A protein has these predicted regions:
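Structural recognition of the conserved hydrophobic beta-strand(s) that form the central parallel beta-sheet
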Residues: 93, 117-123, 144
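A cross-kingdom feature that marks ATP-driven nucleic-acid transaction machinery
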Residues: 5, 14-15, 21, 30, ...
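Hydrophobic anchor at the beta1->P-loop junction of P-loop NTPases
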Residues: 25
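Conserved lysine of the Walker
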Residues: 33
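Interdomain hinge/linker elements that couple catalytic modules in large macromolecular machines
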Residues: 158-346, 360, 367
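Short glycine-rich substrate-engagement loop in P-loop NTPases that contacts/grips substrate
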Residues: 55-88
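Short regulatory helix/loop adjacent to the ATP-binding pocket of P-loop NTPases
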Residues: 109, 126-142, 154-159
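Conserved catalytic segments around the Walker B and adjacent sensor/switch elements
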Residues: 42-59
């Protein structure tokens, strides 16, 4: 199993909660939820039962229709799974709990009983049909699990030293030098291409074959498409999802739903975006109408951009119209030799990094009065009651007209300004020019 940062959060929950809450881990399909939870169960408990509700028998699911006799429930589970449960020393895992809403509702009584600990995993947790007619337990602590971040990817390929050293570089505010920078950029581009889905990472490690890695990612994308069709048989969710790379490549000030779904009503659009967001396959960046430390209070729900939650899946979706993404394309991307403008690939990677760091995504556009075109700040972070605007480029050019205009307009609100680009660390007056591999330290 790959080392995952969320394991430490599981340990923290076990110690702090002492069985007073269940832990609900939300995440997209195939990010590794079940794997890490089962590893946690093996290492930290005397015994455990894992109930995979996507495969559980009808008899097991029916046990949760009447939980008035918990002694009977636990006896039946031990018989079904041939596992002895020990009071306060065993864990029961509800895997894919969205497939059995009554099991999720039972958490209230199970936690109050306090005999065992409970971890739930799921995707599409809040979709209407998955919470219909059940009482959502208040005894849940929710955490999100994302694809492997850059550091977890490096751990997987046997590198435990680069990130701690990069943190020192970031803190020092000095460049690393041309030779080391080239290697760091190539390594980061490798992460952007493979991504953080454990199956794809494992395939890369075992075969070093981009075509096989790409097929794994296509299989995952097809799985997501199947999930979308179960939620929305009309195919609208799938269309919105598939269009994400093209929409970002347009460089428009928002995701233009009308160019994907003609004549769709506003309330239907908002519901579709909420469902995509709930699937954890998509990251939503909202327009901050008034950029300040409280941007969540003034975001425009109707003006947004969509990103994929995994940079590797994004790379594959970019070339979805081909039978497979040829090795030559991967090689050119890896060596920074592809002539296409890849700004949207870099922006998607930055969105993923910021989300993994726990930041909500916001951006801001405003009119350039002389050209009548928009300035755009790609991302805005809230820090210390101020904001940090970020502009992202896929080149090494230190041009930053949008940052400069934003600075003039909101000078009293800004803590730090960042230009993310492909060159080594530099300072351009009061702007920090950072290579993309340092974004994780913002």
């Amino acid at each position: 199993m790959f080392r995952r940062k969320i394991y430490d959060k599981l340990l923290e929950w076990k110690t702090e909660s002492d069985g007073r809450t269940a832990l609900l881990i939300e995440g997209a399909r195939r990010v590794g939820k079940s794997t890490v939870v089962e590893e946690f169960a093996k290492n930290e408990y005397e015994s455990y039962i894992l109930i995979d509700f996507s495969r559980a028998s009808k008899a097991v699911k029916e046990l949760f229709e009447d939980i008035s006799d918990l002694d009977y429930l636990f006896l039946q589970l031990q018989l079904q799974y041939k596992v002895d449960l020990h009071e306060r020393r065993s864990l029961i895992i509800f895997d894919e709990v969205q497939q059995c809403p009554l099991a999720r509702q039972a958490i209230k009584a199970l936690v109050a009983d306090h005999r065992y600990d409970y971890v739930e995993t799921g995707s599409l947790i809040s979709i209407k049909r998955n919470v219909k007619d059940i009482l959502i337990p208040s005894e849940e602590r929710k955490i999100s699990m994302y694809p492997m971040d850059h550091e977890e990817f490096l751990w997987a390929v046997g590198d435990t030293t680069t990130i701690p050293l990069l943190k020192k570089v970031f803190d020092s505010g000095k460049p690393v030098g041309a030779q080391i920078h080239r290697k760091l950029m190539r390594d980061f581009r490798l992460y952007m291409l493979v991504g953080g889905m454990p199956q794809a990472v494992n395939e890369y490690i075992e075969t070093n074959n981009f075509r096989k890695v790409d097929q794994i990612k296509r299989d995952i994308l097809n799985l997501y498409e199947d999930d979308f069709k179960k939620i929305d048989p009309t195919g609208k969710l799938s269309s919105l999802f598939d269009a994400i790379p093209a929409q970002l490549n347009k460089n428009a000030s928002r995701y233009q739903v009308s160019s994907v779904l003609n004549g769709e009503r506003a309330e239907n659009i908002l519901e579709s975006i909420a469902e995509l967001k709930d699937s954890k396959t998509v990251l939503v960046s909202y327009h901050a109408n008034d950029p300040n430390a409280g941007m969540s209070n003034n975001k425009d729900l109707g003006k947004f951009k969509l990103f994929l939650s995994d940079t590797g899946l994004f790379t594959t979706l970019m070339f979805k119209d081909r039978d497979f993404t040829e090795n030559i394309i991967y090689e050119k991307l890896l060596n920074d030799k592809l002539s296409a403008n890849l700004g949207y690939l870099y922006k998607n990677a930055v969105a993923q990094i910021l989300t993994a760091n726990g930041d909500a995504l916001f951006y801001h556009t405003f009119m350039n009065e002389s050209t009548r075109r928009n300035y755009e700040i790609d991302f805005i972070l809230a820090r210390k009651n101020k904001v940090c605007p970020i502009e992202v480029k896929s080149s090494g050019y230190k041009t930053h007209a949008s940052l400069d205009a934003f600075s003039r307009k909101f000078s009293d609100r800004i803590l730090d300004k960042y230009l993310i680009y492909t060159k080594d660390f530099a300072k351009d007056e009061d702007i920090f020019c950072l290579p993309i591999y340092l974004v994780q330290f913002l």
